[in-house]
């Protein structure tokens, strides 16, 4: 299994604010673009991927929306609006949740009130963690053993204190090249490298 975590530090956890933030300063469209490129292939979807979207602009708890492609039946279409609507639905379902609670949104989709740090701690048990860094090991030279998990951010970089936590959990830095890319572009390159080496 491949896992991808997108930490969206400016994405609101209120569904209406989330939808209103498309194309605005919070750039919530990044979540839909990344989800699209992580899950879908031509005329189908990957069945070996789990995607976690962590939305952190909140008055109570972060929301982590999980898309497990092994169990997803119908996501509503291969376009930005369908994916944004699915995320907004998850946010609506999460209203009133207490800390570290989980609810089912649809088949293969859940929403939880867990933080990025807690999520990554949990994933570190079963996954080899990787974070993007221009100075990291080239993805073409990196050996992948077992289940890789790739940690990405929206347009707001990962805070320094998070890097220290991730290092303690064994996260390794990998590079996709000399340019800073959008998360939605990173996932395409990562999938391509892993597909070639399978």
From Swiss-Prot:
One of its GO terms (biological process) is tRNA methylation. Keywords: Cytoplasm, Methyltransferase, S-adenosyl-L-methionine, Transferase. NCBIfam families: PRK02135.1. SUPFAM superfamilies: alpha/beta knot (SSF75217). Its EC number is 2.1.1.-. It is found in: Cytoplasm. The keyword Disulfide bond does not apply. This is Putative pseudouridine methyltransferase. GO terms for molecular function: S-adenosylmethionine-dependent methyltransferase activity; tRNA methyltransferase activity. It holds the Pfam family Methyltrn_RNA_2. S-adenosyl-L-methionine binds at residues 132, 186. Coiled coil: none annotated. Belongs to the methyltransferase superfamily. TrmY family. InterPro entries: Alpha/beta_knot_MTases, TrmY, tRNA_m1G_MTases_N. GO terms for cellular component: cytoplasm. Signal peptide: none annotated.
């Amino acid at each position: 299994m491949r896992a991808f975590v997108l930490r969206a530090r400016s994405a609101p956890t209120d569904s209406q604010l989330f939808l209103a933030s498309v194309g605005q300063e919070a750039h919530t469209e990044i979540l839909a673009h990344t989800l699209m490129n992580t899950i879908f292939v031509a005329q189908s979807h990957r069945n070996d991927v789990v995607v976690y979207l962590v939305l952190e602009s909140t008055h109570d708890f972060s929301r982590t929306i999980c898309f497990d492609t092994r169990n997803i039946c119908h996501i509503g279409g291969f376009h930005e609006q369908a994916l944004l609507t699915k995320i907004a639905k998850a946010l609506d379902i999460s209203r009133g949740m207490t800390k570290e609670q989980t609810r089912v949104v649809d088949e293969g989709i859940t929403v939880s009130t867990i933080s990025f740090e807690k999520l990554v701690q949990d994933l570190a048990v079963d996954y080899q963690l990787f974070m993007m860094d221009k100075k990291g090991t080239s993805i073409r030279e990196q050996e992948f053993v077992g289940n890789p998990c790739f940690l990405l951010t929206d347009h707001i970089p990962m805070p320094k204190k998070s890097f220290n936590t991730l290092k303690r959990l064994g996260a390794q830095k990998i590079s996709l090249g000399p340019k800073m890319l959008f998360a939605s572009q990173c996932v395409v390159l990562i999938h391509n490298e892993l597909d070639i080496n399978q």
